[in-house]
């Protein structure tokens, strides 16, 4: 993807945007929008128009941001302990052999599965206890209701 640069403002012009103007003498200009094209025809100096790239370069706008960005990118790494674990403990875990780590993981998984089985057994026991005292529910006697007497008279 070829990017053009606006002849007046200095902004990038992406394909499908902007306007190319070729003068009679063969010199070509590329403008990002009508505003920059009009300013060019009015012979305004882009170094004096505050929104152009040339103005920003002339008055060193945005230069301090780039410097601070570069300063921030140089970071030094320091090893510290995390809450609840000292640096020595962390390093010991890190330097463990893979076999030891795998064995510990398998043991933890086994313990978790045992705990899950225990919970399921307790649930089943509770269900069995609840089912034992089942008595036949008493049926309620149906109420006999009389139909209301028909209304005499009409609607009015």
UniProtKB/Swiss-Prot annotation:
Annotated GO MF terms: mRNA binding; structural constituent of ribosome
Annotated Gene Ontology cellular component terms: cytosolic large ribosomal subunit
Region (Disordered): 110-156
Compositional bias segments (type: Basic and acidic residues): 110-123
Swiss-Prot/TrEMBL GO biological process terms: cytoplasmic translation
SUPFAM superfamilies per the UniProt record, alphabetical: Glucocorticoid receptor-like (DNA-binding domain)
Domain of life per record: Eukaryota
One Pfam family in the UniProt entry: Ribosomal_L24e
InterPro entries tied to this protein: L24e/L24_sf, Ribosomal_eL24, Ribosomal_eL24-rel_N, Ribosomal_eL24_CS
Stated family: Belongs to the eukaryotic ribosomal protein eL24 family.
UniProt protein name: Large ribosomal subunit protein eL24
């Amino acid at each position: 993807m070829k990017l053009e640069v606006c002849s007046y403002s200095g902004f990038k012009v992406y394909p499908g945007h902007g306007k190319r103007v070729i003068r009679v003498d063969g010199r070509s200009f590329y403008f990002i929008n009508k505003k920059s094209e009009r300013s060019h025809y009015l012979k305004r100096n882009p170094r004096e128009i505050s929104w152009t790239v040339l103005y920003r370069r002339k008055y060193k706008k945005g230069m301090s941001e780039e410097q601070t960005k570069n300063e921030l990118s140089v970071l030094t790494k320091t090893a510290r302990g995390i809450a609840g674990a000292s640096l020595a403990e962390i390093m010991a875990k890190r330097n463990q052999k893979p076999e030891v780590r795998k064995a510990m993981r398998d043991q933890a998984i086994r313990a978790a599965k045992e705990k899950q089985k225990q919970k399921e057994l307790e649930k089943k026991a509770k269900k069995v206890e609840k089912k034992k005292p089942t008595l036949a529910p008493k049926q309620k006697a149906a109420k006999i209701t009389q139909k209301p007497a028909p209304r005499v008279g009409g609607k009015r």
